Design a protein with these regions (language model features):
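N-terminal glycine-/charge-rich "phosphate-binding" loop or analogous flexible N-terminal tail
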Residues: 1-41
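Short acidic low-complexity segments
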Residues: 28-39, 50-53, 172-187
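Phosphate/diphosphate ligand-binding glycine-rich loop within oxidoreductases
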Residues: 41-115
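Glycine-rich, N-terminal phosphate-binding loop of Rossmann-like dinucleotide-binding domains
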Residues: 47, 66, 193-195, 222-223, ...
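Phosphate-coordination loops involved in phosphoryl transfer and adenosine-cofactor binding
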Residues: 81, 132-135, 216
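C-terminal helix-to-coil terminal segments
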Residues: 85-99, 107, 113-114, 253-309
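Glycine-rich NAD(P)-binding loop of Rossmann-like domains
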Residues: 114-147, 174
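Rossmann-like adenosine-cofactor binding region
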Residues: 165-260
Length: 309
């Protein structure tokens, strides 16, 4: 029984050896290695090539090497009848929590302006409201979003969350559905996007959304680059409708060298590292989910392909 792995070349051999050690009962092969496609039962993938998964006639399960599954669903020839499992866990949640809290605090305390003043050798003292007067909004209340919202509330921020369906999170005012979206946006000074990427959320961070935020609001996008209409953000920054942005994900990755975000004084660019999967803990989570699936046990990270999350 063969498990095939598709991942970037930098860590491919490590992943193969680590998963083989965790799953000795399986024959782990890299995507481009020789093997009999009829023997493949499991595929562990990150950004697999279009049409690649359909070539395994006996494939039983697909595992995403991360919490996001859009990189799998984008395949027009995806065998959509197969179970799809994402990879989550404490490690990924902790990393996302750290990143989001860091950048909410950075924007709340106006550190970009202080850093710019340092470059001018200017002693700039800014008075900020206390955290309990700063309204933070988290879009997307899945495992990562709910944890970040809860953590921001524990830091003292006035936190709201928005999702398609109702949630109940201690310390967080929860909004649900399109009919309460404008109300959520109107009270949000720092907006964190942690939505899954679906056809309904693609391009959601656009001029229309920015206009419904308070003037001078800030944006943090740690979901997917396709959530953001980049030109609309640049225009909103130029007009002052948006004060600053921290972006970890982009439509094109790596971000092209000539992209205006690189040099923009009000945009912080990070290279998709907010919740980068750690091979040790991530490998264990993947192996645990595969074993649960093979034993016919419930898999908590099983996703609904039609919903997209």
């Amino acid at each position: 029984m063969t498990l095939v792995v598709h991942v970037g070349p930098a860590r491919a051999q490590w992943w193969k050896e680590h998963l083989q050690g965790l799953l000795p009962e399986l024959d782990v092969r890299l995507w481009d290695e020789p093997y009999d496609v009829a023997d493949v039962r499991q595929a562990v993938v990150w950004k697999p090539p279009a049409g690649g998964l359909k070539r395994f006639p006996n494939l039983e399960v697909i595992v995403s090497m991360g919490a996001g599954i859009d990189h799998v669903l984008v395949d027009p020839e995806l065998p959509r009848h197969l179970p799809l499992i994402r990879t989550t866990g404490f490690d990924l949640t902790q990393r996302m929590r750290e990143y989001v809290c860091l950048h909410v605090l950075r924007l709340h305390r106006r550190l970009p302006e202080i850093e710019a003043a340092q470059g001018r050798r200017e002693w700039l003292q800014l008075v900020n409201p206390p955290a309990y007067e700063r309204k933070v909004g988290v879009m997307g209340l899945g495992n990562l979003g709910a944890d970040c919202a809860r953590s921001l509330s524990m830091l003292g921020f006035d936190v709201a969350g928005w999702a398609r369906r109702d949630h109940d999170i201690e310390g967080v005012e929860c909004f649900a559905g399109n009919d309460r979206f404008d109300e959520f946006l109107a009270r949000t000074e720092i907006l964190v996007c942690l939505l899954p990427l679906t056809e309904a959320t693609r391009g959601i961070l656009d001029a229309s959304l920015f206009a419904r935020l308070p003037k001078g609001a800030c944006i943090i996008n740690v979901a997917r680059g396709e959530h953001l209409v980049e030109r609309d953000l640049l225009d909103a920054l130029a007009s002052g409708q948006i004060r600053a942005a921290a972006l970890d994900v982009f439509h094109d990755e790596p971000l092209p060298h000539d992209h205006p975000f690189w040099d923009h004084p009000d945009v912080l660019v990070t290279p998709h590292v907010a919740s980068l999967i750690d091979p040790v803990s991530g490998g264990k989570a993947i192996a645990d989910n595969i074993r649960r699936f093979m034993r016919g046990e419930p898999v908590p990270d099983l996703v609904d392909i039609e919903r997209g999350y």
